[in-house]
A protein has these predicted regions:
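A conserved catalytic-core signature of glycosyltransferases
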Residues: 75, 143, 148, 226
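Short, glycine-/aromatic-enriched active-site segment of Class I SAM-dependent methyltransferases
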Residues: 122-146, 155-156
């Protein structure tokens, strides 16, 4: 399940892509299969990075014209030279970082001029509901330390000499799932409603029936769990 729409980045062959906060590699693999690129996935969590490494062979096209590599790093201190990457993806990361301004500075620094940047964070309203339903959700180690408003995040990037391109929201059907998890936080693993809704989401991702695709499209503006914003560095 990808949050960033890879198509909207207009990936060109012979480019470098950084997925900052790559997790288990979902966006890395999507970019890798899209064009002849050098894709770099970096995350603070070594366990997630190892899972990405372990998962890559099923996507490996064994081509001399593309590559995909992984490593660990701190988003506030990236080990790359200025203007290294043509494209930068940062999906569901900034809400975890206390020193978020330093992380955004680094994102801009390592992106080339005219390079594309795609950032996603939890949308304000669905996230606010989660925080309201469960204090434990807020206090999860390594969890979310802030709730972004769309205009706040957009301004944060634009003032660093970047041009806004477009935005959209994703995963509306996932918002009720997280609300249920927060409502039954201490017993979520045993909750009938949580488990059944999870089964529904898995079924939906596998089958993609028209009715749920249509329903999610209609609900995105209201409860889309993630807000995705695309920029170009001036």
């Amino acid at each position: 399940m990808q949050t960033i729409n890879i198509q909207k980045l207009n990936l060109l062959d012979n480019s470098k892509v950084l997925d900052l906060g790559c997790g288990e590699g979902r966006h890395c693999f999507g970019a890798y299969m899209h064009a002849n690129l050098d894709v770099y996935g970096f995350d603070l969590n070594p366990d997630d990075v190892q899972k990405a490494i372990d998962n890559f062979p099923q996507f490996d096209e064994k081509s001399d014209t593309k590559s995909c590599s992984f490593g660990c790093t701190d988003a506030t201190k990236l080990p790359f030279a200025d203007e290294t990457f043509d494209y930068l993806i940062c999906s569901e990361v900034l809400e975890h970082i206390p020193e978020v301004d330093r992380a955004v500075d680094e994102i801009i620094r390592v992106t080339k001029r005219k390079g594309k940047i795609a950032v996603s964070v939890p949308s304000f309203f669905p996230e606010w509901v989660c925080w309201s339903l469960s204090k434990d959700y807020q206090l999860t180690p390594g969890g979310h330390v802030r709730i972004f408003r769309y205009k706040q995040l957009r301004k944060m990037v634009e003032k660093r000499n970047c041009k806004f391109i477009e935005k959209h929201r994703e995963h509306a059907l996932h918002s009720p799932y997280w609300w249920l998890k927060c409502l039954f936080w201490k017993n979520q693993d045993k909750s009938y409603l949580v488990n059944k809704y999870h089964d529904f989401l898995v079924w939906d991702m596998m089958k993609k029936p028209f009715i749920t695709r249509f329903l999610e499209k209609m609900l995105q503006p209201l409860i889309g769990k993630s807000t995705v914003i695309y920029f170009e560095k001036n």
